[in-house]
């Protein structure tokens, strides 16, 4: 029996998500925003951007956004879905770029981070002037609509419920892979569409690897166990990490947990609209560096989350991305001791003018799990 977590959005409806976000009115507003940001027709080839703008989920489609026209190019497999979109639909063979260049204007903008070289070469050979863009649609997607925020809140509510159950589970004697399977199946039971990404369960020395793959390692007493796992609802992701203890920890790890938590709380306080990702990262990083552990925090403080698990804005030392109201980001410092273990504490938040709306409710105090 599925034990679904009910989440009510600000509108009062249960489980509002991507489908409501992609009604005709919403799509036209999104397209209008893209049109305002370009000075040449934009060829959209990144699948998630095509999906966000039209509602078409396809592995072989392109979208041309023109000032007064919107065209989807796809093959017969996706025609029925494409015809439901608020756009003209043009059927072309599966080899999209064998036919597409002859149907395009002589000058277009394109998504430089998703268009492969062979496809660009086909455009060039057809004499089409190409103008590269970087993260244009992604920058617009970074500010979430109410329905998108509700879907992310729902995914976070399921993640929180899973963590409550996880804290009651035995860890010692189980493998990382067993616990990862339990996490994913529990999120399904709670009503998730699926996991936002393959769950990370990293025990002992594996915890020093930020993106460790759970394997056959058996969890032992006196270790940290880094659990990075979250739910997905209606195409929108959550994200969360908590670090558990399986008994008294070595002093080095116990101190690192306290420092990581202090840095995480400072980063949360700094996560406000109008600040750059670099500046927010620096606030948390300074706390960890002053404690003498800065070299062990080797990744950025956080990233945007939405239809993708990693989106704009980035919060890392070199990032000039500016945080905006209704953006969704992680705040996740980590301290990693090679050969010993790791600590990471991650919350998902909605950016506000002042304090962020924190979606992760599971405690950040160090939880010692049983057996």
Describe each region flagged by the PLM.
Residues 2-371:
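Active-site neighborhoods and metal-handling regions in enzymes and metal-associated proteins
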């Amino acid at each position: 029996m599925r034990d679904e977590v009910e989440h009510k959005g600000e509108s009062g409806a249960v489980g509002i998500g991507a489908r409501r976000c992609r009604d005709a009115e919403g799509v036209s507003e999104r397209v209008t925003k893209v049109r305002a940001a370009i000075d040449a027709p934009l060829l959209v080839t990144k699948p998630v951007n095509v999906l966000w703008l039209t509602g078409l989920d396809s592995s072989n489609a392109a979208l041309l956004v023109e000032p007064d026209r919107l065209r989807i190019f796809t093959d017969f497999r996706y025609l029925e879905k494409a015809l439901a979109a608020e756009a003209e639909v043009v059927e072309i063979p599966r080899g999209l770029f064998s036919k597409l260049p002859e149907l395009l204007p002589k000058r277009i903008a394109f998504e430089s981070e998703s268009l492969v070289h062979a496809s660009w070469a086909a455009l060039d050979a057809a004499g089409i002037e190409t103008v590269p863009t970087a993260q244009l649609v992604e920058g617009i997607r970074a500010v979430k609509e109410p329905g998108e925020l509700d879907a992310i809140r729902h995914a976070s509510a399921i993640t929180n419920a899973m963590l409550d159950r996880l804290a009651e589970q035995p860890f010692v004697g189980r493998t990382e892979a067993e616990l990862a399977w339990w996490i994913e199946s529990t999120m399904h039971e709670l009503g998730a569409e699926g996991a936002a990404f393959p769950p990370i369960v990293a025990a002992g020395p594996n915890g020093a690897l930020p993106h460790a793959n759970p394997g056959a390692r058996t969890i032992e007493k006196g270790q940290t166990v880094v659990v990075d796992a979250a739910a997905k609802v209606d195409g929108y992701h959550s994200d969360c990490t908590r670090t558990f203890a399986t008994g008294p920890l070595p002093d080095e790890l116990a101190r690192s947990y306290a420092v990581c938590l202090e840095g995480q709380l400072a980063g949360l306080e700094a996560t406000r609209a109008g600040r750059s990702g670099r500046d927010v990262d620096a606030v948390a990083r300074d706390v960890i560096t002053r404690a003498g552990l800065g070299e062990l925090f080797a990744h950025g403080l956080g990233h945007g989350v939405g239809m993708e698990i990693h989106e704009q804005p980035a919060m890392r030392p070199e990032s000039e991305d500016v945080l905006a109201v209704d953006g969704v980001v992680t705040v996740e410092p980590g301290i990693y001791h090679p050969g010993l273990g790791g600590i990471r504490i991650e919350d998902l938040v909605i950016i506000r003018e002042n304090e962020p709306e924190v979606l992760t409710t599971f405690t950040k105090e160090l939880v010692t799990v049983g057996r």
